[in-house]
Amino acid sequence: VTTPTGHTVTPLHRNRNYRLLWTGSAGAFLGLFALETAMPLLILGTWSSAALTSVFAAVQTTTTVLCGAPAGWLLDRYDRRKLLVLAETARAAALVTLALALWLGQLTIAHVITTAAVLGSMQTVGTARMLLVRASVPDEQLTAAVTGEEVRNNAAELAGPPLGGVLFALSPVLPLLAATALFMVSAGLTWLVRLPARAQSPAASGEVLKGLTAALRERTMRAAILVLMLINSVAWIAQLVTIVLLRQHGIAPWLVGLVVAGFATGALAGTVLVAPLQRRLGPGALLLVVGLAQVPTLAGLALPLGPLWAALMCLCFGLGLPQVRVLLDVLVIRQIPDERRGQALSGVFTLLSLSLPIGMIGAGMLMNYSTPRTTLLTLASILLLGVACATFSRSVRTARWPGKS
């Protein structure tokens, strides 16, 4: 491929490092999304506790928050490829022990919660894959590479939940073993990646949060992060509540997985809307539109109209999610120097995850003392209130993309 400047670059499909990272990441994401359905089903089937499913999710996100800044520091100081291999191997090891305990009939709540902590802490190191991809392709191909990542992630999110549901229906141990194998495939392919040596920044111990403060220094990013935190937390909580709601109505596990896959189906379809919407709306206005559009879909999930209707609402909710992810890439990843990019990326993801633990526990308690439908309506109200407050900010409404006046 010849760029407008006359520089010849290797097509992405022939870029060895990119292919290895893309394929390995596809397996890792497929395993993660399969677990998102399988773990709540496992907990509900073993202990019949909706609150415990929320505790599992809350522990996972809490460890992600706590480990975010240290993980970013590690990613900027040490070999990102080796750190990613270590993270994938640790996740596989945790799931193997869980599968063995389940097979032997020795599964305990403490073991499940410990697994949640391992998965959450390694998730922060898993952001290394995003940085490795950017080191594998030239600037001219970065947009195409990011689009390829988005398609891969959404495809995995689409296939993962039904895969988790189907495997769980066959045997509760199968989704754990499948995710283990996929994590190990990812680790093996990542180990084969060969990149030029990167200049390592001798970061001091007091610089752990510098990447985050650099991201927050930008006006649009400060405003966007607040809305992104709300959209992100509501999206994850809504998936969990939907699973509990459908199971309470006797919907089969495999069908629950198909319904929840509607979130990913919408996100995959939403990738075609990224370019046209960004040509017409600034980043702040786009966030507000996405947030407002998701309110009626949350309320719609609360209507007792069956699994087909629920799948349609999940699909509509997911349409706006690619906009959120591309916004992060444009305003954070591309704007921060590589020597601080790990800290900035981990810091922003830490903030996005910050509201999840409280939200997950609150949703679990609300489901215990009321109903999943009430929980969904509460989420819709909170999202509406947050976006409505953000619309009063002129800096959010008039924010523009980098490079535009």
Predicted regions span which residues?
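Alpha-helical transmembrane-bundle signature of multi-pass membrane transport and export proteins
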Residues: 1-405
